[in-house]
Amino acid sequence: MRTPYLLASACTASDPAARYHQAELAIWDELTGSLAEYPRIWRSPEEGAMVLAEEVDELWDEIRGNHIGRARAEASQVGAMALRFIADLYEPDGPGGAVERCRAAAAEQHDAMALVGPRGRQCASSHEAFGYLKREFDALWSAIRFDEPARPIAARVAAMAVRFIAEITTSSTAVAVSVR
């Protein structure tokens, strides 16, 4: 995985809005790489959700290990798979091919930014940010399970991945956790 956008979004001295744009670019890089490496369109919401679940689990593993740089990289993969969920399952015959399908999904993610995470403030820690992301993923799985619209929820998962990347740039204050 390439990380120039992840490095740029970690720069807290720059324009705060630029961090979100750089996070979106990191997700776009992951998405285009995924399309090149795995061009087959997903066949069901269940398939897409389980690919996304794998990335969510890998993100949690990095957070638990306090590997913030790697967690941000995993968050870009979560965002990419959430966008791919929309592009593959809801725009499979869209005009312009895969890139245009993905641009439509990215626009939905951008529009969902104000709907996710804590209102009026940044995420306090990687654990909190993951909690919000996991809540959106759980809502996605619930929508699939009960045959409800999943597309807008997938956009919310991607939007929360953007917030994770943009807002979690260093190791957060240690969170008390049980060690086994």
What are these regions (language model features)?
Residues M1-R180:
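Flexible "arm" and connector segments at domain edges
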